[in-house]
């Protein structure tokens, strides 16, 4: 895994992708830091971090689109799979390399509260706790990007899928309001999601038996639960969407 990590980290540090990612994150951070702290004199660095969470919508797809998709396109994934490193080790090595690239601008951002302390009182505890939450939020977004890069050999498709899903997570509060909270509508929605999951599994492993079994078992379990106790489905969509609302988790960090 260490060899994969070093190889991937070197590839990003010797190309424009890694530097473009870091530049964009620091550019947005600088703009909001100037607006909130330097111009408006807000004493809380958390305002800047909370305002710039949208940066992941653009920066993460750029960073992650090639990490595994390029391997599949160039057919070099076969070399990786025949290496003594496990599949989980390959994925983890690549993921940690991306997180390391992301950690570089985070280290730079860690100096901002120190700069603020020269001009007034700064709550370092809350500032660095917010920075930790921002780092974890970005790491979660990067994991999503790695997943979509793994299921396609097209960098463009991987980037688009990552953007769409991150945008959906970003707008989760608004999306949840469009769904009914009734048990029936929730059950039907979950049934559709199970079918979609089965199709995704089939597209990845090309095994109709396994994907079909997942679909049948999931749908049967859904019907049984609805018949036995339908009340558990009330407001279920909103509860599930809240779990995937990454931005709200950061705001409450």
Locations of the language-model features?
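Select subsegments of transmembrane alpha-helices in polytopic membrane proteins
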Residues: 17-22, 97-103, 186
